[in-house]
Amino acid sequence: MIAALQRKKIRILELLLKQTEDQLALRLQVSCENITYEICFFNVSCLHIWQLSMPAEIHGFELIDHRKDGWGRHAFYEIHDFEEDLIHFYCEEYRIERRD
């Protein structure tokens, strides 16, 4: 389902960063082409957010799978937005759900 959010204009409606036990979790509620999605990222590390104003608009996400490269659990996936690089981080796991 991440393909539905790649290289498309996305509006970030809500951004929630939460510490659970010894890990960070990031939850985004986004809108793309009049469809709302909830994206949850677990065991987030190296989180960078630059000059982001709400409601923010980005041009899609790129998700790079590093599992086959032998990277550590905290960096199984690398996520960043296209073009502006306003959001960049690594995570162990993610979940995307459509919310209509």
Where are the regions a protein language model picked out?
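Surface-exposed, interaction-prone regions used to assemble/regulate multi-protein complexes
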Residues: 1-100
